[in-house]
């Protein structure tokens, strides 16, 4: 064999080894995007289900739910596949399901909302909390396994509370010894009448909350819920936002220090747009039920109010604002700069993917040091959490040590 032929063979073997070692470009790109955390433009890797610690990943155990909350029973019946379910287009059924979930999994004794206010889906709401718990624990959004559970478990350990979100038990009784470390202080912007984020955050992680809203009726109802649940008392405070044009101003006080802020911003830009969206959801649910061969509604649901009044309803502040989600996020980012040293992490849900780029530009303009985008998925619905901090990594590390 000539020297030229030997050289060609060596080159061929080297190329084959490199080919075997090389990972698909798409996976490499997705992984790098998932870890991007400064001025981060791309999104994280796509997720196809609820968070690994979400108790509702495998659906609902309706027999247990009925046992915990008998008021749910009239709304439960077998679906065409023989599994127990409810009519998710029926607002009374959804409301009864929410109460049962809160009673069974989150040790809430009383929960109710007035007619016309949003009735939130609990699995999706608690998912947001699980992902920001990971954020506080310093876990990348696509981390899975024991390491993630151990680190987030430590958050519960610090606060001497039951860890309600461990997947192996729906109502764990174990309490963790307090290590006399920091307790998580959270701020919920636009809590609504349901107060669902503070309720879940307190019961799943032992966090303490300040919940704000522009609607006095929402604040009144959340206060009523707190008054009827000893588990929430002393852990949830409400503040009324009197200036509808403000987000943080008028809510964050001079001596406040928040580890995390969260928000589910108004989605629509007008009342007509919100109404169209609600009607579209109702029609889609009805079509889906018909396609699956569901039978007519039982007596318990015949007297139900219009579907827009509860599960796809909502007051003005809950569903829409001038400029819609894009403008609300712009206002939030701009105001967050004024409280840069009072909050470790600012976060918000972003429903419309096209609103991310304007947010990135706004965050760069105000000088955010770290920006993260965390994808979430509930069934076919995709959304994401946008998180940003004005503190350097060193300042973030010192945060827990020096804040009161």
Swiss-Prot record:
Segments of skewed composition (Basic and acidic residues): 30-54
Residue ranges with Basic residues bias: 1-10, 18-29
A cellular-component GO term for this protein: cytoplasm
Broad class of the protein's primary localization: cytoplasm
Keyword flag rRNA processing: yes
First-tier enzyme category under EC: transferase
GO molecular function: 23S rRNA (adenine(1618)-N(6))-methyltransferase activity
UniProt keyword Glycosyltransferase, yes or no: no
Gene3D superfamilies given in the database record: Vaccinia Virus protein VP39
Subcellular location: Cytoplasm
Composition bias type Polar residues, residue spans: 157-172
Record-listed E.C. numbers: 2.1.1.181
Domain of life: Bacteria
GO annotation, biological process: rRNA base methylation
Region (Disordered): 1-54, 156-177, 289-308
InterPro entries: METTL16/RlmF (IPR010286), rRNA_lsu_MeTfrase_F (IPR016909), SAM-dependent_MTases_sf (IPR029063)
SUPFAM superfamilies per record: S-adenosyl-L-methionine-dependent methyltransferases
Reaction(s) this enzyme catalyzes, per UniProt: adenosine(1618) in 23S rRNA + S-adenosyl-L-methionine = N(6)-methyladenosine(1618) in 23S rRNA + S-adenosyl-L-homocysteine + H(+)
Record's keyword terms, sorted: Cytoplasm, Methyltransferase, rRNA processing, S-adenosyl-L-methionine, Transferase
Similarity section: Belongs to the methyltransferase superfamily. METTL16/RlmF family.
Record's function text: Specifically methylates the adenine in position 1618 of 23S rRNA.
Name of the featured protein: Ribosomal RNA large subunit methyltransferase F
């Amino acid at each position: 064999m000539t020297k030229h032929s030997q050289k060609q063979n060596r080159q061929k073997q080297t190329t084959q080894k490199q080919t075997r070692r090389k990972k698909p470009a798409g996976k490499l790109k997705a992984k790098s995007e998932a870890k991007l955390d400064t001025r981060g433009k791309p999104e994280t890797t796509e997720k196809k289900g609820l968070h690994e610690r979400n108790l509702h990943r495998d659906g609902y155990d309706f027999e247990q739910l009925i046992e915990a909350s008998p008021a749910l029973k009239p709304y439960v019946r077998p679906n065409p596949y023989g599994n127990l379910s409810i009519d998710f287009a029926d607002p009374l059924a959804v409301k009864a399901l929410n109460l049962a979930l809160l009673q069974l999994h989150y040790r809430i004794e009383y929960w109710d909302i007035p007619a016309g206010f949003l009735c939130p889906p609990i699995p999706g709401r608690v998912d947001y909390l699980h992902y920001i718990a990971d954020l506080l624990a310093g876990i990348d959004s696509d981390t899975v396994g024991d390491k993630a559970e151990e680190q987030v478990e430590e958050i519960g350990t610090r606060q001497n509370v039951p860890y309600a979100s461990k997947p192996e038990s729906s109502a764990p009784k174990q309490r963790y010894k307090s290590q006399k470390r920091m307790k998580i202080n959270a701020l919920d912007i636009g809590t609504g009448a349901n107060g669902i984020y503070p309720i879940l955050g307190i019961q799943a992680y032992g966090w303490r909350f300040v919940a704000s809203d522009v609607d006095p009726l929402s604040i009144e109802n959340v206060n009523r819920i707190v008054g009827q649940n000893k588990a929430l008392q002393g852990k949830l405070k409400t503040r009324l936002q009197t200036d509808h044009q403000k987000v943080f101003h008028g809510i964050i006080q001079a001596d406040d220090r928040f580890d995390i802020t969260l928000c589910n911003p108004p989605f629509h830009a007008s009342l007509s747009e919100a109404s169209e969206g609600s009607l579209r959801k109702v029609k889609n649910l009805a079509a889906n039920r018909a396609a699956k061969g569901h039978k007519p509604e039982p007596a318990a649901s015949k007297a139900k109010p219009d579907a827009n009044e509860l599960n796809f309803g909502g007051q003005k502040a809950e569903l829409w604002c001038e400029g819609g989600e894009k403008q609300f996020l712009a206002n939030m980012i701009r105001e967050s700069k004024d409280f840069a040293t009072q909050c470790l992490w600012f976060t918000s849900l972003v429903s419309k993917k096209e609103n991310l780029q304007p947010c990135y530009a706004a965050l760069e303009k105000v000088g955010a040091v770290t920006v993260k985008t965390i994808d979430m998925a509930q069934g076919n619905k995709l959304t994401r959490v946008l998180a940003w901090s004005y503190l350097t990594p060193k300042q973030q590390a010192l945060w827990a040590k020096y804040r009161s």
